[in-house]
Amino acid sequence: MSTAVETGSSPAKSNSNNSSSGGNNNNGNGNLSPNAKGVQRRQLRERKQRKLYLEEWSLGDEDGEGTRGFSVAEKLESSKFAQAGMVREMRGCDLTVAFLQQHGFNIPLLFRDKAGLGLRMPDPQEFTVNDVRLCVGSRRLLDVMDVNTQKNLQMTMKEWQQYYDSPQKDRLLNVISLEFSHTRLDRFVQSPEIVRQIDWVDVVWPKQLKDAQREGTNLLGGMMYPKVQKYCLMSVKNCYTDFHIDFGGTSVWYHILRGSKVFWLIPPTDRNLQLYEKWVLSGKQADIFFGDTVEKCARVYLTAGNTFFIPTGWIHAVYTPTQSLVFGGNFLHSFGIVKQLKTASVEDSTKVPQKFRYPFFTEMLWYVLARYVHTLLGHSHLEGEASLSEDEMAARPHTHLTHHELFGLKEIVMYLYDLPPQKKNVPSLVLDPVALIKDVRSLVERHCKDQQDLAITGVSVLKSPPGSQPPFLLYDRTRVKQEIKQEIARKNAEVIREQQQLEAGRAREAESDTSQSTGVGSVIGMGAGVEYSNGVMKKEQLENGSGVTVGGHGSQPEATFALPTDTLKYRPPKKMHLATALVAAAASSSSGGGGPVAGVGGSAVVGSSHSPTGGGVGPVTGAGGAISVIATSSSYIEGGQVGGILNMDNCHSPEGGGAKLSPNLTGTGQPRRRRTRCKNCAACQRSDCGTCPFCMDMVKFGGPGRAKQTCMMRQCLSPMLPVTAQCVYCHLDGWRQTPVSPQTKQLASADGPSALMECSVCYEIAHPDCALSQLDGTEDAADAKGIVNEDLPNSWECPSCCRSGKNYDYKPRHFRARQKSSEVRRVSVSHGQGGAEGHADGNTLLPPPVGQYNDFVFTSESEMESGTVSGHMTHWKHGMKRHHQLEVKTERNNSCDTPSPGISPNAIGGDSKVGKRRKSDDGTSVSSSMHESNDAPCGSSAEGAGGAGNANVSTNQWSGSGGGGGSRKKNSIRSQLAQQMLNSSTRVLKKPQYVVRPASGTGSSSSSGNGGSASATNGISNGSNQSGANSCGAGNGERGTNNGGLSGSNGLGNQHYSSSQNLALDPTVLKIIFRYLPQDTLVTCCSVCKVWSNAAVDPDLWKKMNCSEHKMSASLLTAIVRRQPEHLILDWTQIAKRQLAWLVARLPALKNLSLQNCPIQAVLALHTCLCPPLQTLDLSFVRGLNDAAIRDILSPPKDSRPGLSDSKTRLRDLKVMKLAGTDISDVAVRYITQSLPYLRHLDLSSCQRITDAGVAQIGTSTTATARLTELNLSACRLVSENALEHLAKCEGLIWLDLRHVPQVSTQSVIRFASNSKHDLCVRDIKLVERRRRNSTTANRSWHHD
């Protein structure tokens, strides 16, 4: 617990407990623990080093495996610790604010009964660890400590509960850090009343911040206040926690609900705190029982029902004789401020990691000052808090402060004053910290003569705001389970509601875009629509006065939601896109034209059913985005009149090709269920791989367990329909039986496979004969057939979707196990035989498709301007009327050179109404036509402006040339379309183009190449009346194969341009121009095109790269390697060792490297045979850089390349080395002079441990005296004038900095300069350099970059 007495995150425990409790082979009763059964393991040495407790615990010391040097059983029986008078027993009613005001809180308090404390707990007879799991969640991650190995583990609450309840335990585990505030358990545990009255979190911390807390765990990223108020401690028998002090000097309340505890207590005297610091830093906690080293140490026994209070700073250890369940909490208060701050200083001296400290400790001190000033002076220093008027403050009586509070406020000010600026942590809500400190000074002066007897009022000066505490509830397991079910249902409803709102919003946006671009011919926006809000469908009037009522009787009540496990019916989700509604509308209106109707005014599109009388309406155009509800009916729509009631509950329209309802819920309002594993394929039978992203997220592989996904290698290849699935029409299951529970269906497989089929388009489950029978009586019933998908069991494209053409509009549903990032699902558009007219040679130029939901909406604004609207609509109707006799398909990554031949039903299975979907060679499915059709070339002519209008085909690739032009290169449009479709993006795909001006003599349109598809500007082409053959011919013109080659096209013919004429794509020209651009502009140039990107990353343009203060991500490291700089600056970056090692091994030309203030572990990565021969190395202000680190860096590398072994350091060619502000001494200077023979510039400024002896090392080195020209010793306070005698031996020294060196006088520096043969002079008091000349000034400027 990061809090209560047994907290593993407490400062002391983070250092001491880890080693002392590790490897104990004796339990509390003196018996051998389970790890010590049989012969004890022989050890060669004892492990006495201090254990490290970091976030990455695996990077610390090895797990403690040694035995303790003392017996806990002996300490339990020793009479030395049976001391009286160190714990005060009290009744609950006696612990009040007046008691603390009078006596303070300096001694532990024991309450045998919780009566009078205001402490409320669940019933100990009924409340168990299983109830804790129920309240905090089975997936809540716990920090678990293995008592014997001292290894940090992470377990889910469910796993911990199973371990806790198991009778046989193979190891000792302890949970001491489960903070349950803002969880369901928070309401059933109420802290003592005295804690609620004085806890700074309740009375000081801003309430709006505490109310903003949403995270139930203790993640610092989501913590809005110090979340340490309520902890649950669960320990098994024989757990022991060594001596520690609770973090931040917090006090602790501790209630034993079940089991028992034993405490050893040591008072926080100055002597004991000093001994404690030495004991923690000694690393011998496992050998020494700290209670033996102090004068007074008392042992206290606690049993179930006892409540215990431990004051600030008390050193204590805990033992668990019986399995226990404990609730507790930590709190700061105003009656122990001095000791709280003193304990914080102990944490600094013992180097407790920040993870184990009180969160927001410094910020809390600022809020304490602000609250006291506002309460006693009326001045507000917090944002959003109003100050009190002087009259109001004058009317109040004078408040007397206790000496605990008065001296505490002074200590807080001094504590904050002594902190360095980067650690003052002034909260953003504090407006002016300086004014706040001044007001605190005035407050202390005003209350310095307060009388102590008048300060005992029984009322705390700082009061908690009303409503700061959650109401207490009696624990009821049944009610909690019901709340959990309701919460799951509510979350399901929220997810579904958000999805519907998102789809409706997209629909409105697309409708607005479409309504702005309509207004041609037969497409008219009439403003009729359906509004969907709060589960109620409302009608809006059409312009002619007729309305549409949706929802059976004009309204639809909000659906109720239940758990997925509460239903036995399986109905997969139905998805309905706008293009489907448009296809259905076109099919219904193909027999005749009525008044045009456009449903673009609402959040849902109402599709009309087929009109038997032939008086259907014209084309119905809707929004190009997602829609929430599309309703159909068999009502008649004639002459623009809309009559009847549209039934929202209809999932299928038996008459005509109306659109289908696309609900997100089943008929009972319950969420959909997914397919189940087949348990037969190789993926189902294998184990987790342990390497994929989902495995790395699993708890058992060390991940956080948030994704909740199965292994990618175990994703079933043939997922089956659940046995509870039923037909949507006859409501029978796949074996023609009444659906029953899954338990009774265990032997269903013995009766054969299920006969149900799931449509991959509309996701409707039905028997094939039931689906076909629903079409009886329609004009297309004879031709209605379905297409079976052999890649997925019980999957097909139902006859209804095939008849309406929806199976060509959308990609079929596929599973991640089959999905490849480079694969694209089929995009097919069916049209009639008239679509082949105008083809000169069967070659096509196919423009790229628009977004997923806009398959039949205009491709671009230029088409509308060119008058191609009528062509679209005319061809659309003809294509739908002729029953898709021609199919244009684009398979995954397969060029569509030849069409798929039509396969008649007789070729598959006699008179079967179900077609087959054969598998292609590459594993992708190729659909065979469900109608007999003639072979046709796979392609269609491009859209000509005002052309014949018989080709509205969208694909993402170039068709092969029939005249031997060869296959076209796959272009960037194809990859973009693949990514767009796989991500289900609704964004309209736009063709990327180079910003290149055409050369003289070209027409108004040009196509840009480099592997991309051609596109025309200002419409499709200039020739507005050219035929489809001319348009196709323009697309079949030869394209330049050179890099950057372009081919232009206009209505009169093709003109070709070589790459030499296009200077904007000439790499040589680009590099010359790029030399004049700053690096940030070069980064922008990389996103223009591939040619520019290759030219912009040329190493000649990136001789120097400055990545200081940047986050070292993988993309940044890759960018550095691509540019191959010679001078790399990584100052003030948190680069890791593995990152720097990876980087330097791939920069062989690197000469200058700067690593200022980088982690020392990263700097040690230079000790490798792969390090480039650097000439300049800057290690200034690297924390932890000492003599040992310098020795490691400058020693020969331990690794070697094949056939090569270095006997000298890889940094031996260094000419410049900067070590300013590091912790090196004279020993490091000796390493430098011995290992770097070519060193010319050495920077040792601000190195406080450098003395005359280190300078003497420079003077006695033959290489240094001959080659060293520049030396910086500024701010080296231990250097004296004797160092100048050694520096006089350096014959080449022409620059010396001795500024801020107090032991060197200016006169001695002047003498040194005058005795030199290099014509030196003294500037800026103690800076020795050569007399300035024009040439030397230019040569010296690089030192001050």
Curated annotation (Swiss-Prot):
EC number, UniProt record: 1.14.11.27
Zn finger spans (CXXC-type): 671-717
Biased composition (Gly residues): 1034-1051
Cofactor note: Binds 1 Fe(2+) ion per subunit.
Chain positions with Phosphotyrosine modification: Y53
Alphabetized SUPFAM superfamilies for the sequence: Clavaminate synthase-like, RNI-like, Rubredoxin-like
Cofactor: Fe(2+)
Sequence positions that bind Zn(2+) 2: C689, C692, C695, C711
Keyword entries, A-Z: Chromatin regulator, Dioxygenase, Iron, Metal-binding, Nucleus, Oxidoreductase, Phosphoprotein, Transcription, Transcription regulation, Zinc, Zinc-finger
CDD domains: CTD_Jhd1-like (cd21783), PHD_KDM2A_2B (cd15555)
Residues at which substrate binds: T241, K261
Modification Phosphoserine occurs at: S58, S79
Compositional bias annotation for Polar residues: 973-987
Biased composition (Basic and acidic residues): 885-894
Annotated GO biological process: chromatin remodeling; circadian behavior; larval somatic muscle development; regulation of transcription by RNA polymerase II; SCF-dependent proteasomal ubiquitin-dependent protein catabolic process; segment specification
SS bond partners: none
Binding site for Zn(2+) 1: C678, C681, C684, C716
Residue ranges, compositional bias (Low complexity): 8-37, 999-1025
Catalyzed reactions: N(6),N(6)-dimethyl-L-lysyl(36)-[histone H3] + 2 2-oxoglutarate + 2 O2 = L-lysyl(36)-[histone H3] + 2 formaldehyde + 2 succinate + 2 CO2
Binding site for Fe cation: H244, D246, H316
Free-text domain note: The JmjC domain mediates the demethylation activity.
Function statement: Histone demethylase that specifically demethylates 'Lys-36' of histone H3, thereby playing a central role in histone code.
Family listed: Belongs to the JHDM1 histone demethylase family.
Protein name: JmjC domain-containing histone demethylation protein 1
